[in-house]
Amino acid sequence: MSGNTGERPFADIITSIRYWVIHSITIPSLFIAGWLFVSTGLAYDVFGSPRPNEYFTENRQEVPLITGRFNSLEQVDEFTRSF
């Protein structure tokens, strides 16, 4: 015999009017907020990733590829100097 945790059954929660009143507002709001976060470019600023037009500059058109095992720090410094 299984015990009772005192929580409402999931079927009761998703069939209640109160659940859908709350979530009919919050789910679209989260979607719109995420879309604005990405479309305005704020995601690039917050996470520090380069924008699509900043991957290759006028000075550096090659892919920044680390090729040496023992001088990798020097190569990273060389790549970051171009920014």
Curated annotation (Swiss-Prot):
Q: Required cofactors, per record?
A: heme b
Q: Where in the cell is it found?
A: Plastid, Chloroplast thylakoid membrane
Q: Which PANTHER family match?
A: CYTOCHROME B559 SUBUNIT BETA-RELATED (PTHR33391:SF9)
Q: Which NCBIfam families match?
A: cyt_b559_alpha (TIGR01332)
Might you report a single GO cellular component term?
chloroplast thylakoid membrane
Q: Which UniProt keywords apply?
A: Chloroplast, Electron transport, Heme, Iron, Membrane, Metal-binding, Photosynthesis, Photosystem II, Plastid, Thylakoid, Transmembrane, Transmembrane helix, Transport
Organism equals Anthoceros angustus (Hornwort)
Q: How does it sit in the membrane?
A: Single-pass membrane protein
* InterPro entries hit by this protein: PSII_cyt_b559_asu (IPR006217), PSII_cyt_b559_asu_sf (IPR037025), PSII_cyt_b559_CS (IPR006216), PSII_cyt_b559_N (IPR013081), PSII_cytb559_asu_lum (IPR013082)
Q: Which GO terms describe its molecular function?
A: electron transfer activity; heme binding; iron ion binding
- Annotated function: This b-type cytochrome is tightly associated with the reaction center of photosystem II (PSII). PSII is a light-driven water:plastoquinone oxidoreductase that uses light energy to abstract electrons from H(2)O, generating O(2) and a proton gradient subsequently used for ATP formation. It consists of a core antenna complex that captures photons, and an electron transfer chain that converts photonic excitation into a charge separation.
Q: Which residues cross the membrane?
A: 21-35
Q: Name one GO biological process term.
A: photosynthetic electron transport chain
Domain of life the protein comes from: Eukaryota
The UniProt entry's sequence similarity note says:
Belongs to the PsbE/PsbF family.
Q: How is the cofactor bound?
A: With its partner (PsbF) binds heme. PSII binds additional chlorophylls, carotenoids and specific lipids.
Name the gene that codes for it: psbE
Assembly, per entry:
Heterodimer of an alpha subunit and a beta subunit. PSII is composed of 1 copy each of membrane proteins PsbA, PsbB, PsbC, PsbD, PsbE, PsbF, PsbH, PsbI, PsbJ, PsbK, PsbL, PsbM, PsbT, PsbX, PsbY, PsbZ, Psb30/Ycf12, at least 3 peripheral proteins of the oxygen-evolving complex and a large number of cofactors. It forms dimeric complexes.
Where along the chain is heme bound?
H23
Tell me what this protein is called: Cytochrome b559 subunit alpha
Iron keyword on record:
yes
